[in-house]
């Protein structure tokens, strides 16, 4: 941006709020385009969902559900850089949750959040038994392995969110978009 070119960043966009503010200021100052590389946003299915929402076929959107995760899927086979706060920084929310959130919010035009309530935990990541070959990884685990959130959005829309790297089931739920005429 500072060199006068458009920029595409891979997720995570940034790790801290301060970094995000600095990048957004740089974009505004440069007059160039900044986009984040969320590949699912550009998929044929997501483009179709966005068109359906925009057409009004679903009516007024009032509820979004974003869920997903992995059964025992903390990314650690290649060392600890992904699970340490200093090097990975984002945990399950930033790794896989960001895709779920982006897909739904993109489909409904990114309404402004009004209130946010959230919870994160690291029940599995900090348990040495989770890493039978490398129990020392548990000591280095510094990010979330589960998160849940509830966001009240502009337009009287509710977003219910849950994501996990490590759970004892296959999914934390599907993506849902509910409107007054369909869903």
What are these regions (language model features)?
Residues 1, 24, 50, 101-105, ...:
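Non-transmembrane alpha-helical segments in soluble domains
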Residues 1-41, 56:
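Beta-strand-loop-alpha-helix segment that lines the small-molecule cofactor/substrate pocket
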Residues 8, 33-35, 65, 117, ...:
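Structural detector of well-ordered beta-strand residues that form the stable sheet scaffold
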């Amino acid at each position: 941006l500072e060199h006068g070119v458009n920029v595409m960043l891979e997720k995570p966009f940034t790790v801290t709020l301060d970094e995000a503010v600095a990048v957004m200021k740089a974009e505004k100052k440069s007059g160039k385009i900044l986009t984040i590389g969320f590949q699912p946003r550009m998929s044929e299915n997501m483009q179709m969902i966005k068109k359906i929402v925009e057409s009004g076929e679903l009516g007024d959107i009032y509820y979004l559900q974003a869920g997903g995760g992995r059964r025992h899927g903390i990314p650690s086979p290649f060392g600890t850089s992904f699970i340490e706060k200093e090097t990975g920084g984002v945990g399950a929310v930033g790794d896989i949750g960001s895709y779920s959130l982006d897909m739904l919010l993109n489909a409904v035009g990114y309404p402004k959040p009004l209130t946010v309530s959230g919870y994160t935990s690291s029940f599995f990541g900090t348990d040495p038994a989770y890493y039978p070959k490398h129990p020392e990884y548990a000591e280095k685990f510094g990010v979330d392995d589960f998160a849940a959130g509830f966001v009240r959005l502009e337009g009287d829309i509710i977003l219910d969110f849950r994501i996990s790297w490590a759970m004892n089931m296959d999914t934390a739920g599907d993506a849902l978009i509910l409107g007054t005429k369909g869903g």
